[in-house]
């Protein structure tokens, strides 16, 4: 196998892999910590550490008391929590650097284990990584699927080639990691197709592979909650379906028109890949079964754009065959030029990282400050600081907020109980205000703001006008970002709630905040 790499790539092929791995690690490690749900993941991990167990009922929101809540990503959340509490933002960047390197290396390992051609292995690994960082990018549990699913394919390959025990152990381990990392854990069973495309289908091996996955899926505290867990996350909800404002839940082909150029290119490649493979490189059985898997990935992408990653992982064997059909560079000088060109992929991604870094708030992200470089941090921080210092918040106060603010606030001001956060499991009476609405929907839904004690919302939101018009509410502070795209928000409180707490609220003032956010200090000068 190594002889193939020396012949096709060159005698320095190992150094090329090292350089590409380092480039991918750096590109991943420098990616900004801007995922909107990172704050929610850290808060969930904090709750698990405090309680010593995973939650089964709603722990954060007053709008769904006692309703089921499953922290199905608890393993990844604890990993991020450990890194953050140990080394702050640097710890999260380091974890992501290793994850990014793993997303590249696991596909390389799959290619070598599957006897793909060296250049097919490199091309598929780089394309997989490019889609991984373009679509997932930030620190989030879904990123770990870029490691576990390729290794599930490798486990299937080992079993087909006679390494049954090693394949079973690897398949079981990847199923355990994935079921405790992401809701779409059944994708680890996709590689069972590998046993069925053989000229004589290996039914016994396929059954063993499925058993290994099934046993792995049971290794979770939510093993007996799968049906309910799927129900509350995938059934009818205002934030699931055509009205959603959640970008990753938007139907894939609707999102295509305004998606990033990298997502459009990846979509076109995946659409064309079955038709780019010469007939001699696929048997009829492979064309049918791998094609069905490709269609399944296409369906998931059509349902929600976040299905793009699953579509990619389902299409790995087809991508390898398509890449193998590309003519290889024959002359040594051409091989060297091609090898150097592959290094431009992580370098190009690295350049895009620096562009994104320019738009990230500068702050002190530690457990003590509870700040995170979320896109909404710039406008929320002055309001959070005011609430800490002037409202003397005790646990249980009801806060009304909006979908885009909720996840950050759950982490930043954990004493409040919030009406909504970044999860799509809320009843329509709450989530309806966050979905697209038309005149055919009847009166505009604003959510349960009248039942809250305080409210934090964008000034351009319709609820802000309702709060200003309601005599029982008082505006306490306005936060305006220096850059218009960062928005403006307000903090309101019920007058009776303020009175019962003995708080005499001052007249509302306005704070302008740039992207250089100071760490919270003493409350003497809020």
Predicted features by range, described:
Residues 24-25, 129-133, 154-155, 166-182, ...:
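Membrane-interface alpha helices of multi-pass inner-membrane proteins
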Residues 37, 49, 183-282, 312:
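Transmembrane catalytic cores of multi-pass membrane glycosyltransferases
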Residues 63-90, 94:
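Short hydrophobic/aromatic helix or loop-helix immediately within or flanking a transmembrane segment
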Residues 94-114:
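Transmembrane-helix motifs of polytopic, lipid-linked glycan transferases
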Residues 150-168, 197, 271-282:
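Membrane-interface transmembrane helices that cradle and orient dolichyl/undecaprenyl
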Residues 388-430, 452-459, 492:
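Short periplasmic/luminal acceptor-recognition loop of GT-C membrane glycosyltransferases, typified by
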Residues 412, 431-489:
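Periplasmic/luminal catalytic loop of GT-C fold multi-pass membrane glycosyltransferases
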